[in-house]
Amino acid sequence: MHRRTLLLAAALSPAAAMAVSGSRAFATGRTFGFSPDGSQFVLDGAVFQIRSGEMHPARIPVPYWRHRIQMARAMGLNTIALYVMWNYLEERPGVFDLTTDRRDFAAFIRLCAQEGMYVLLRPGPYVCGEWDLGGLPSYLLKKPSIRLRVNSGQDPDYMAAVVRYVKAIAPVVRPLMAANGGPILMVQIENEYGSYGSDGTYLEQLRQLWLGAGVEGPFYTQDGLGQVVANHTNVTGGAIGLSGGTSSDIRACRTAYPRVPAMSGELYPGWLTHWGEGAFAGQDTDLSGALRDLMNARQSFNLYVVHGGTNFGYWAGANANDDGSGYTADITSYDYGAPITEQGRPAPRYTAYRSLIGSYPGVSLPPLPEPVPTITRTGSDAPIPSAYASLWDNLPAALPPAQTMAPQPMENYGQNSGFMLYRKVLPGYAGATLDVTSVHDYATVFLDGVYQGGISRPAVPSAYATPLKVTTGSRLALGSAGPRPTLDILVEGMGRTNFGHGLVDRKGITQQVSLSGAGPLNGTLSDWQTYALPVDEAFVAALRPKISQPGRAGVFFRATVTLAQTGDTYLDMSGWTKGAVWVNGHNLGRYWSIGPQQRLYCPAPWLTAGQNEILVLDLHQLRPQPIPFRASLVETPCTLTNRRSGKLLDVPDWSTASGAQLNQWSGNGGANQRWRRTTAADGICTLTNVHSGQLVDIQGNASTDGTPVIQWPANGGTNQQWRQVPTGDGYAKLVSVSTGKVLGVAGNATSDGAKIVEQTDTGDLSQQWLIASL
């Protein structure tokens, strides 16, 4: 499936003492459980409503952990839910890191206690969470026949790894449980298992594993209402949390399970976004009604997520159909449209939810913590990197030939993420079509160092694919070359599927490679040279500054930026094509021009007052572009007011239909009159409607006066790009990059409903617009 479906269920089991020794938040001797009839959670004998917000320490810079917890508490919440990502703690079999940087989840939990917040712990082993492989370690995929999320009888190797994981983290979890003076109210068993299977033996083995490690619960599970009812994927003595759970869903669950407590375990204030989608998802979600119902009924809930954070590095996940088709990779930002933005600021809905929750008796609203300052550098102050090193001049030794006869995925070589290079000399070459049966996930192809084109597993809009010669099929025509050219296929793994039955999603080339129409080379290719390229922090730290082939893509660009002071910022990569960025050695994550994300979050603690290094690896670009520093992920929504009529650029009748012609209308405060302006480094902008997520577009890319200006999904075309030309007093003309004509009102009319068209510039006031940020 392309998206994680809305599910419904989570189990919480009875009783445990609640206290935090040495913490200002709690005292010893507290008890937590639920009422005998399962209708309520109970703390110290009194009904207790869990008002939780989810955030993940792995996605938040450590210096900001306390700030984000305080933001959740100031919204009226009393609990933090968090995933523990197994693969982030154990990247190699048996080698655990529970203390370095964002991996120290126990320190995060202790901060929750210090801030007076309880905790719902969600340690998997599978978590989904739009995280690579749903948190399962990629080393599991080295076994060809691996079966994931099954009991020990079905795959003892999988379950043995789970046992090792639980035994490693249980000593950390145990003292933080309520019964032992910690803030953890409940521990979740697995995650949304009802959408994957119905193996009760597996769930019980997990429960017994925790019990055997001294963690006695309470436990809970998380599922969709339909799934938990159909597949009975709750656990003995546990409660049920419902994905997308409304007040009525909780009542329905308790009808199906009369003596089991239920809560809204994942209530979605936004949604996830994939590369290539027209706009950030979930921006218009309003949970006010659902929250009011839950508060009125004193039912427990968890906002997934109250703060999303960032998929730094290569940790973002993906979605795909069960057979692996329809693959879509998640963007780097995990802003999610959450009440607390990626950079920790209150989103527009934050204040509304805070006021709603705070209006109920017994809810206190602490003041918001101070926001982190931001810094910007634009125009001539924006850094412009210089070519620094070539990936091709920094190749490691090839892997042993015995292991590389046929192309194999990176997991077979113990590599978790990054890139793989597959190299083959082609004796007797006379032209051919390359057929790479299964690229996971994005390949650039070279013949004797000359770029031939690309192969992408994710769909790429034609406006981006055509100039780069990127195909989403498997076949790529190769050009002419000498009689023994070297074929290089560089493959980027973009994130493993994290939901559904297609979890076994290996990276690199996963099947055969062949040539057709090539005489003696016709057929399957073997005897490859293979290079493992994790391109991680250690790799970039050891780069040799050498570029022996300046015209060959795969260049690292470097800039040094001197800052008088630090602050949060976003690196605007809209002038670049596809790659990754490091700042002072920290991997900010992937960027890709197909969007919708164009800016990468750089937290202030990763910058220094003084000199800072920006390093960019771009898979296609040979000429560097400026990298402006911006204050936010996206521009603040704006309105466009026509100078002659005083009316606003408007999508009529709140239409979401592609092709709807725009008009002008009196201001109504609606999202159909609000636009997100994304401005590239060269001053060219696009305008995306906040309501529909579609862009201002010249119909059919026609250049005739009077051509309708419509809304249309993002396609990268120049007919969706506009130059802003100031005309004085804050007004500007919007000039089409494609046609050179301007955005105007048909007939220079001033009436509501007058159509928006392209026109030759006449200087009329109806061709001028005031762009005002909200």
PLM regions with names:
Residues 94-100, 125-150, 317-329:
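Aromatic- and acidic-residue-enriched segments that line the glycan-binding/catalytic groove
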Residues 26-79:
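N-terminal carbohydrate-binding accessory modules
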Residues 245-331, 337:
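Catalytic-core region of carbohydrate-active enzymes that cleave or remodel glycosidic bonds
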Residues 635-774:
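Lectin-like carbohydrate-binding module/patch detector with strong preference for beta-trefoil
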